[in-house]
């Protein structure tokens, strides 16, 4: 609830019609006096300028016009003649004036449309018909009620008899559903319903004994319901009427402390009603249930007018006699934390002075609407959730929209079910490692040639010899066979059938090699030709019939040089001579004899000589010279397949990828330059063969876009552009994934911060992860996101989303039960320092180590445990005099089997069925309420609290009888379990009052009751305890007794408890309740024992030892066996008629499941008539307290309100409270309304004391409300 703008005027107001930027028209209020006592009366228009952020809160008028008289009321309606509409003013001089808003804003000299003077006195009220904007109703003095038509403004007609009534008509309102029905309210208390069509009176209501009517308003949706208000200080009421039963109001709304002056019922939400009045307050109600939602900031003078904005109900305006018109919103714009922080900065020094806080702290919004306004509510809504979920909200029963009960559904959503199945199948195949099957499936289902080729190439890479498979894929093995066949047709073979032995020549020379037939026929003329070389084989004494001469004399010089070089073994020189003489055949023969160096020299010379020769020689040169780069860089791209085949055949494994990549780069450049898609596809082949993922991905992404556009153009009715895109993306991701698996690709750039080669692929991975997550496949999405670099910004966000969505909520580990410990332990107990308490011992005391002591219980997390070492019984921030507070070591627990003690202070006996006692205290958190009383500091105490309370205070010394105390520092004197604190006169010096500071923490629950010595229990104590008074006392097993709790000093907000405290799930079991507080009893000091105490009588460790019958309600029991009666402390026996208390069972055994409530919490529509005053009065007073309470006490006030709501729920369900209690609570509410706090307090005490079984957590809220109401001005 934020104040948006302020208009510094005391004026009547009207909102502009239409949905344009809102304006407000103001007219100087008749009878109001400004601070400067000016007599000027003006009509002004104000532009709120809400679109300007941080604009000035106080506005300046956009138009201004002086008038002859002051205004009682203003109305603004739409008009065909004016875009901004017509403004009507009800003037004190009896004139009805109409102005053109457009002319006013433009500054025209004649904005007045008309002026009528039919009224004989002041015009008190007017309103345009909501259905027929040309009809205007005006009411004034002497019962004058006129209906005017703007089209004929000079001839209105009057409703009612002239002499019937002479009272003034103060207010009127047109019915929102039936346009010819009008209601008026008069100063004489008549509420009259008129039928304008028949010009007759239809119905008259008696307004609560004819009390004056200040405002009337029709229900926006129900034509028979209306609301009236009373302006009297004695009866500041709002009456809700249903005309179907007009004898009495249907509901009375009480909340204003003084007369109600104005009402405004929200047209967009009938559950919202504004009222303002003489108590300077503007209150928001639910008129359907009577619930007061809260009030807006209180001003310093009467709020005489409030109006909702007719088109934007988030805003409303309120006019008051302090000279301000406030434009506010019902939307909160500041969090509670900010508001609390702001309040803490202005908190007064004195926390006890409530009035100082109330005056110094700014009044802020004190409520929030429990449900969203109707214009923000939706009967159904839906939202997509991350992870393929759709959250939808719809009415449980659409046939009953008024029920407003909704159901939330979370369902799975898939944009494309085919995609989900495809992804699942693909992921399963990947896990199985069956890549070949994936490739075969994708080849069969390929939608275009490019995809088919890509998958075939990837399939070839899976084989054992990928190079040979690439050659086969290119078709070169069949071409070799075709060439051999064409050579055989030329007759170059020896025979058609075979060689000399009938075996095909190709078989004898190897597969695929055939003998040249023509050469064979040339050398077949000599029979010995085949055996020539055999005959020349080296053998000793070999002699043939073919002698020769090394020199014949006819040789050329070159022949002689070659011969001489051969004789000397100088093959290189012989080769040089052969090359010089261009004897290439001889050169090669010599080179063969000379070794590899000569061969290389001969080959080089040959290729140099054959530069202009056939192309195969260039190819041979590259192969022989191992310079395949010449083919890659210089071979024509039209023969890229031949180049790839050559590379596959002759390239080494090390240079193969680079050679293919270079050839692919040339093809890609050609594709970009010429726009040739075939070259791009060939480039993709080369990149795939070279396993260059970063190169082929760019081509695949381009193809993806092209294929997607083509598929969209050819799409059928059942396909959407998104599903087509997702399938194309799925195909891309599958190809990349399989390719990475086949090539064992490792991304070396995952640790780089930027400039990644695979940026395009990373973007697709992110997109695919989003699609997979949207289909509920979070694991798949996470796997692909893990492939991205760690520093990728989009990947970081996507990973976090996946992580949050897949993160399993770890169940909180339950507190471990304390297992039963062994009876024997040799570990001495730890003895920490005792926190300083209220009782000051004179000397430190210790306790002997107990060999039978059970181990200390495990430290279990306790949200109510105190922080630090503060005592649960001493207020925070208070430390008594240092000389009275020596540090005392904490003794061990009580002995289990009668072992001697050094201390004369023993703990109280523990029953056999009780758990080990634990002490909890109020936590330091400020958002948790106290357990039983008003917080200190809420109101100023009538008497200051003292560290040592008065002995005359009749308080209960210990509200938790069967518990072990939290072991504070104690006096050497033994203190009776029911002994009050020592009186002031016994102290050696006065204890100073505590310093000012925050309110002390209080215990949220009493400690658990005791357990038999040596037997720690694993069972939880019952939570159904309702009474803190002891019911029975059993014989203690030792001389120990309880330490009393420190009672509070007298305070109007923290009075001493005069009756049993409220029902509390941490309180002991209920029993017979005393009718009055117990008086303090004198303590009997027991001297320290001279020896080991006598052992307790044999008894079951799990049974009670009941006391003997008592002679009176306060008679002490007989002395216990084995104890000294002279020093036995006095205990209270059970009251007459009470039976011994059975052991409290576990929470599971005693606590019955609460029956289901008949109606949901917060429902107030079923509160019976006899309980309705309780609800109305307590709610109204609670809202009054909330409005004036300082912000620093927001938590305590909210807790009281929460507890009151528990009471209202019980009343609505008609459970827990009996009829007599309901009647008593009604009397309490009436006393509270009359400010009779003493009577309210006594009724509260009576219910608390005598009907405690009907008191739940709600009773504390009633008690707090009484105290707060008394402290609130």
Swiss-Prot record:
Cellular localization per UniProt: Cytoplasmic vesicle, COPII-coated vesicle membrane; Endoplasmic reticulum membrane
A GO cellular component annotation in the UniProt record: COPII vesicle coat
Bias (Low complexity): 951-961
Biased composition regions of type Pro residues, renumbered to the chain: 991-1004, 1047-1063, 1076-1098
PANTHER family registered for this protein in UniProt: SEC31-RELATED PROTEIN, SECRETORY 31, ISOFORM D
Membrane topology term: Peripheral membrane protein
Main location: membrane
Species of provenance: Ajellomyces capsulatus (Darling's disease fungus)
Protein name: Protein transport protein SEC31
């Amino acid at each position: 609830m934020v104040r948006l703008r302020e208009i510094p005027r005391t004026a009547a107001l009207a909102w502009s019609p239409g949905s344009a930027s809102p304006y407000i028209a103001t007219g100087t209020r008749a009878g109001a006096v400004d601070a400067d006592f000016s007599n000027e009366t003006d009509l002004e228009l104000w532009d709120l300028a809400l679109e300007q952020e941080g604009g000035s809160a106080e506005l300046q008028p956009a138009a201004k016009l002086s008038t002859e008289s002051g205004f009682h009321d203003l109305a603004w309606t739409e008009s065909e003649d004016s875009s901004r509409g017509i403004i009507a003013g009800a003037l004190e001089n009896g004139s009805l004036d109409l102005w053109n808003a457009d002319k006013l804003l433009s500054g025209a000299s004649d904005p007045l449309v008309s002026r009528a003077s039919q009224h004989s006195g002041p015009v008190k009220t007017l309103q345009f018909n909501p259905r027929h904007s040309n009809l205007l109703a005006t009411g004034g003095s002497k019962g004058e009620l006129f209906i005017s038509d703007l089209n004929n403004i000079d001839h209105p007609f009057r409703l009612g008899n002239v002499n019937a009534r002479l009272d003034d008509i103060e207010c009127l309102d047109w019915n929102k559903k039936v346009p010819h029905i009008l209601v008026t309210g008069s100063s004489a208390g008549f509420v009259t319903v008129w039928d304008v069509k028949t010009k007759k009176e239809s119905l008259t209501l008696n307004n609560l004994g004819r009390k004056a009517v200040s405002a009337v308003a029709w229900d926006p949706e129900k034509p028979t319901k209306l609301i009236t208000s009373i302006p009297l200080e004695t009866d500041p009421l709002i009456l809700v009427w249903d005309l179907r039963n007009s004898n009495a109001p249907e509901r009375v709304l009480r909340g204003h402390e003084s007369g109600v002056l104005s009402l405004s019922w929200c047209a967009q939400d009938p559950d919202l009603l504004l009222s303002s009045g003489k108590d300077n307050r503007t209150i928001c109600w639910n008129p359907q249930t009577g619930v007061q939602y809260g009030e807006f900031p209180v001003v310093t003078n009467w709020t005489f007018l409030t109006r909702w904005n007719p088109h934007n109900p988030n805003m409303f305006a309120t006019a008051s006699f302090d000279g301000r018109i406030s434009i506010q919103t019902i939307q909160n714009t500041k969090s509670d934390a900010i508001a609390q922080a702001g309040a803490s900065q202005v908190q007064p020094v004195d926390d006890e002075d409530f009035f100082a806080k109330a005056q110094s702290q700014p009044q802020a919004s004190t409520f929030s609407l429990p449900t969203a306004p109707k214009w923000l509510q939706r009967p159904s809504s839906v939202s997509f959730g991350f992870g393929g979920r759709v959250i939808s909200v719809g009415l449980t029963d659409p046939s009953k929209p008024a029920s407003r009960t909704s159901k939330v559904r979370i369902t799975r959503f898939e944009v494309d079910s085919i995609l989900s199945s495809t992804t699942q199948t693909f992921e399963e195949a990947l896990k199985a490692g069956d890549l070949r099957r994936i490739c075969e499936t994708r080849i069969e289902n390929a939608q275009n040639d490019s995809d088919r080729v890509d998958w075939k190439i990837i399939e070839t890479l899976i084989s054992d010899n990928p190079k040979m498979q690439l050659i086969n894929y290119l078709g070169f093995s069949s071409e070799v066979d075709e060439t051999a066949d064409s050579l055989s047709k030329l007759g170059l073979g020896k025979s058609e059938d075979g060689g000399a032995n009938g075996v095909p020549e190709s078989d004898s020379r190897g597969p695929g090699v055939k003998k040249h037939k023509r050469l064979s026929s040339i050398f077949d003329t000599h029979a010995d030709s085949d055996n020539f070389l055999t005959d020349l084989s080296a053998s000793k004494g070999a002699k043939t019939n073919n002698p020769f001469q090394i020199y014949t004399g006819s040789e050329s010089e070159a022949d002689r040089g070659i011969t001489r070089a051969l004789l000397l073994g100088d093959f290189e020189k012989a080769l040089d001579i052969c090359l010089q003489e261009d004897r290439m055949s001889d050169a090669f023969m010599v080179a063969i004899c000379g070794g590899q160096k000569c061969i290389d020299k001969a080959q080089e010379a040959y290729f140099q000589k054959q530069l202009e020769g056939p192309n195969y020689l260039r190819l041979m040169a590259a192969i022989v010279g191992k310079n395949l780069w010449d083919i890659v860089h210089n071979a024509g791209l039209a023969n890229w397949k031949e180049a790839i085949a050559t590379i596959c055949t002759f390239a080494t494994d090390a240079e193969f990828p680079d050679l293919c990549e270079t050839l692919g780069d040339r093809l890609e450049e050609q594709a970009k330059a010429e726009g040739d898609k075939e070259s791009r596809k060939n480039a993709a082949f080369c990149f795939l063969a070279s396993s260059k993922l970063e190169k082929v991905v760019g081509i695949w992404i381009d193809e993806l876009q092209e294929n997607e556009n083509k598929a969209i153009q050819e799409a059928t009715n059942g396909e959407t552009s998104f599903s087509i895109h997702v399938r194309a993306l799925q195909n891309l991701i599958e190809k990349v994934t399989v390719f990475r698996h086949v090539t064992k690709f490792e991304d070396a750039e995952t640790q780089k911060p930027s400039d990644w080669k695979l940026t395009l692929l990373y973007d697709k991975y992110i997109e695919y992860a989003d699609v997979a997550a949207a289909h509920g496949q979070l694991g798949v999405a996470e796997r692909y996101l893990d492939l991205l670099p760690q520093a990728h910004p989009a990947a970081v966000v996507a990973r976090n989303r996946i992580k949050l969505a897949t993160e399993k909520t770890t169940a909180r580990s339950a507190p471990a039960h304390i297992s039963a410990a062994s009876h024997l332990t040799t570990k001495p107990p730890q003895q920490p320092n005792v926190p300083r308490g209220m009782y000051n011992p004179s000397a430190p005391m210790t306790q002997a180590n107990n060999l039978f002591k059970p181990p200390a219980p495990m430290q279990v997390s306790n949200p109510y445990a105190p922080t630090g070492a503060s005592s649960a019984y001493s207020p925070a921030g208070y430390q008594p005099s240092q000389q009275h507070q020596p540090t005392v070591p904490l003794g061990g627990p009580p002995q289990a089997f009668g072992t001697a003690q050094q201390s004369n202070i023993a703990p109280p006996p523990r029953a056999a069925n009780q758990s080990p006692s634990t002490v909890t205290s109020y936590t330091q958190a400020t958002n948790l309420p106290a357990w039983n009383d008003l917080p200190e500091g809420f109101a100023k105490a009538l008497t200051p609290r003292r560290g040592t309370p008065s002995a005359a205070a009749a308080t209960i010394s210990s509200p938790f009888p069967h518990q072990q105390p939290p072991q504070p520092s104690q006096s050497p004197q033994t203190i009776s379990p029911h002994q009050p604190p020592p009186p002031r006169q016994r102290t050696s010096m006065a204890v100073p009052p505590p310093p000012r500071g925050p309110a002390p923490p209080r215990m949220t629950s009493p400690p658990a009751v005791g357990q038999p010595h040596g037997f720690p229990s694993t069972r939880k104590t019952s939570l159904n305890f309702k009474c803190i008074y002891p019911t029975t006392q059993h014989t203690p097993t030792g001389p120990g007794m309880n330490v009393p709790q420190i009672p509070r000093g007298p305070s109007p907000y923290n009075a001493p408890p005069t009756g049993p405290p409220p029902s509390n799930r941490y309180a002991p079991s209920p029993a017979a309740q005393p009718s009055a507080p117990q008086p303090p009893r004198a303590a009997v000091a027991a001297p320290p024992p001279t020896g080991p105490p006598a052992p307790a009588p044999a008894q079951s460790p799990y049974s009670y030892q009941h006391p003997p019958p008592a002679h009176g309600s306060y008679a002490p029991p007989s002395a216990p066996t084995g104890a000294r009666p002279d020093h036995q402390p006095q205990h209270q026996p059970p009251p007459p008629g009470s039976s011994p208390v059975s052991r409290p069972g576990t929470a599971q055994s005693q606590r019955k499941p609460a029956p289901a409530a008949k109606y949901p919490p917060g429902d107030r529509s079923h509160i019976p008539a006899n309980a309705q005053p309780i609800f109305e009065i307590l709610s109204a007073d609670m809202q009054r307290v909330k409005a004036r309470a300082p912000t620093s006490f927001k938590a305590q006030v909210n807790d009281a309100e929460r507890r009151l709501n528990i009471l209202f729920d019980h009343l609505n369900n008609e459970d827990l409270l009996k009829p007599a209690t309901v009647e008593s609570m009604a009397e309490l509410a009436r006393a509270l309304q009359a400010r009779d706090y003493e009577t309210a307090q006594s009724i509260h005490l009576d219910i608390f004391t005598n009907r405690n079984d009907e008191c739940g957590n709600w009773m504390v809220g009633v008690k707090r409300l009484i105290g707060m109401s008394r402290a609130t001005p």
